[in-house]
Amino acid sequence: MSDNDTIVAQATPPGRGGVGILRISGLKAREVAETVLGKLPKPRYADYLPFKDADGSVLDQGIALWFPGPNSFTGEDVLELQGHGGPVILDLLLKRILTIPGLRIARPGEFSERAFLNDKLDLAQAEAIADLIDASSEQAARSALNSLQGAFSARVNHLVEALTHLRIYVEAAIDFPDEEIDFLSDGKIEAQLNDVIADLDAVRAEARQGSLLREGMKVVIAGRPNAGKSSLLNALAGREAAIVTDIAGTTRDVLREHIHIDGMPLHIIDTAGLREASDEVERIGIERAWQEIEQADRVLFMVDGTTTDAVDPAEIWSEFIARLPAKLPITVVRNKADITGETLGMSEVNGHALIRLSARTGEGVDVLRNHLKQSMGFDTNMEGGFLARRRHLQALEQAAEHLQQGKAQLLGAWAGELLAEELRLAQQNLSEITGEFTSDDLLGRIFSSFCIGK
């Protein structure tokens, strides 16, 4: 398998459809056109032609589009064949194309990978293609499109350029120490560094919003049996996703629902009631509940308000709180306010949010929705944002750490060499986002998650 091979793949989803598209990219795309179509179509014009088998019989007829490189998505010669979307027809056409020597099925994401390697896209834009396809809300789709059009890359490139200028200034001060002006202590470098740090902080804030849009928040509902966990899942989901009865232990396994709160994806997980298991099935369900809790972004500690007046989670169930992972945020949800007569709403107890509601009637559930959105710092008024992945957040975080360390070196010891090194490392972290500085292993992991035809 070589990167110089000509590749082919179906660009439309598998299964029956009105239209099915095969995409070919590489040096032999021209030969495919001449062999299957009998001619080379006019560049960038839709040509309605028969698609022929090796014996000259017609396999299908449809639209052929020819994009000679480098003016194509991949930067190579690209041919698209748009025929009928029946799986048998597409399979016959694909087999016909693969009889031509030098062609092979594309790896997942290989078309986008070639576009990146041929400088048609940077890495953040290439990732945005997959994010646009996988977008689960209108806001996520718009943000992914902004990233694809270069909004995120432009912000990162601006930071890289600012760091380049700052490095030049710092290294000039190091190389010419005998100048009358002490460049390191005259305040200009500190001012420029502060500007870069402020710009980076703004990008990090937007990236966190973009990450929430892409990945969402994982919330686990946990508590004793019959506390109303499944009723809360149904209230948040807006449908009967879980079976609700008065019988303790009705929920035996993990139930998952995917919803949106003003555009923010929320992964809600209902778990088995936590207690001493009465049988093997319940024991497995409780083990799975704890596994989900350990991976959660937040736990909703569900409490039956008719069984206790306590509001401090440690007082309600100290063993449960002690077993939770350190620093895992907890929201105490006192349920059945319709029975207890408690005042609906949110307050705080020993650093934990406390919400009183009725999962059965839905009263107070909107307060919980707003709390979940605000607890993640999600801004529904964000305009023109971009999507971001975990690796982007990590790169931005590492760059920020290097800039803060560089600032400490500047102000503490006027150590120009150490400042220059921290600036270089920060610049390297930022360049990883757009792919200017990256490893082949990282590229392989990124593009392998794409669709075959992308």
Curated annotation (Swiss-Prot):
Superkingdom per UniProt: Bacteria
A matching Pfam family: TrmE_N
TrmE-type G domain boundaries: 216-377
An example Gene Ontology CC term for this record: cytosol
Cofactor note as given: Binds 1 potassium ion per subunit.
Enzyme Commission designation: 3.6.-.-
Statement: the UniProt record of this protein carries the keyword Ligase: no
Residues bound to Mg(2+): S230, T251
InterPro entries noted in UniProt: G_TrmE (IPR031168), GTP-bd (IPR006073), GTP-bd_TrmE_N (IPR018948), GTPase_MnmE (IPR004520), MnmE_dom2 (IPR027368), MnmE_helical (IPR025867), P-loop_NTPase (IPR027417), Small_GTP-bd (IPR005225)
Gene3D superfamilies: P-loop containing nucleotide triphosphate hydrolases (3.40.50.300), Probable tRNA modification gtpase trme, domain 1 (3.30.1360.120), tRNA modification GTPase MnmE domain 2 (1.20.120.430)
PANTHER family found in the cross-reference section: TRNA MODIFICATION GTPASE GTPBP3, TRNA MODIFICATION GTPASE GTPBP3, MITOCHONDRIAL
Quaternary structure and partners: Homodimer. Heterotetramer of two MnmE and two MnmG subunits.
Biological role stated in the UniProt entry: Exhibits a very high intrinsic GTPase hydrolysis rate. Involved in the addition of a carboxymethylaminomethyl (cmnm) group at the wobble position (U34) of certain tRNAs, forming tRNA-cmnm(5)s(2)U34.
Name of this chain's protein: tRNA modification GTPase MnmE
Source species of the chain: Escherichia coli O7:K1 (strain IAI39 / ExPEC)
Name of the gene this protein is made from: mnmE
